[in-house]
Amino acid sequence: MIKKDIIIIGAGLTGLVLAKKLKQSGKECLILEKSRGLGGRVATRRIDEMGLDHGAAFLSQISHDSELKSFTAPQGFYIKKGMNNLAKELSKDLEILKEQKIHKITKVSEGWLLVAENETQFQCQKLILTAPLPQAMELLKQNSLAPDSSHPVHGIHYSKAIILLATLNELKPEMQSLDFETHHFLLMKERDLHPNGLVMHLSEHFSEEFFEQTDEEILSEVMKILKRSPFLKNDIQKFELKKWRYSRATSTYPAPYLEISPDLYLAGDAFAGPSESAEALLPVL
């Protein structure tokens, strides 16, 4: 069994920022991440050795530092060398265990007992869940820890996202930002990642309607749209799709975190976001 004073579930931006702030304040913690990577929805995909951001394309409400470069999006920033580079920088000197999907949480006299699907056991005094709220709530529900159904946290929902990643023969000047049939093209112009890269965020309506369809069916619909664009119909070299079931919280909880039970907390983008949740949690951890 692995014992720590503080355990954070989720190595997305909230979990990493919180762990970094805890370390800076002299407190040690352990992050448990279910996947093989870091950053959650702060994600970069490589196509032909070139990178394209397919998660959170821009960051707001974040402090300037050497890894941030101003972009034309209002109050937005992108990360040089890819959004995932931010996660890598934040994770330096942090204790993180990957591929540890927790499925059991039990209150014990010493705090909280966690069991991963691979049967690894963890114990902590304080536990923070930073996964997208629907995933965190499902874990709590499975362990009879979820708030009553009348609690306002149940009213928070997420929108889905379907994203097309493509490389073009060339990026024309007219294509710096192109709105076309309610779909917005976020173009990686003058990026360190891929000078001719295109990231197309399909509308929320399209994403909701087609999310459960196969990639082939979705691409067929997307190509119908692109073929009507004078800028794109003959320029795409390679492309692939990415999906986010929990892309963005459509509303937020009116507090930076929620204490579900003594020493058991929810935090993240459905609350006040990475920095605000972390700052608010520090005094109670």
Task: Please provide the spans of the model-predicted regions.
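Core beta-strand elements of the Rossmann-like FAD/NAD(P) dinucleotide-binding domain
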Residues: 2-4, 117-126
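A conserved short coil-to-beta-strand element within the FAD-binding core of flavoproteins
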Residues: 98-113
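Beta1/beta-strand and adjacent pyrophosphate-binding region of the FAD-binding site
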Residues: 1-14
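Glycine-rich active-site loop/strand segments that organize a redox cofactor
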Residues: 34-78
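Short beta-strand to alpha-helix junction loop
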Residues: 58-65, 73-91, 212-218
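Central helical "cap/lid" subdomain
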Residues: 39, 121-176, 232-234
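Conserved flavin/dinucleotide-binding core of flavoenzymes
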Residues: 17, 37, 54, 195-285
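Glycine-rich FAD pyrophosphate-binding loop
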Residues: 7-9, 20-47
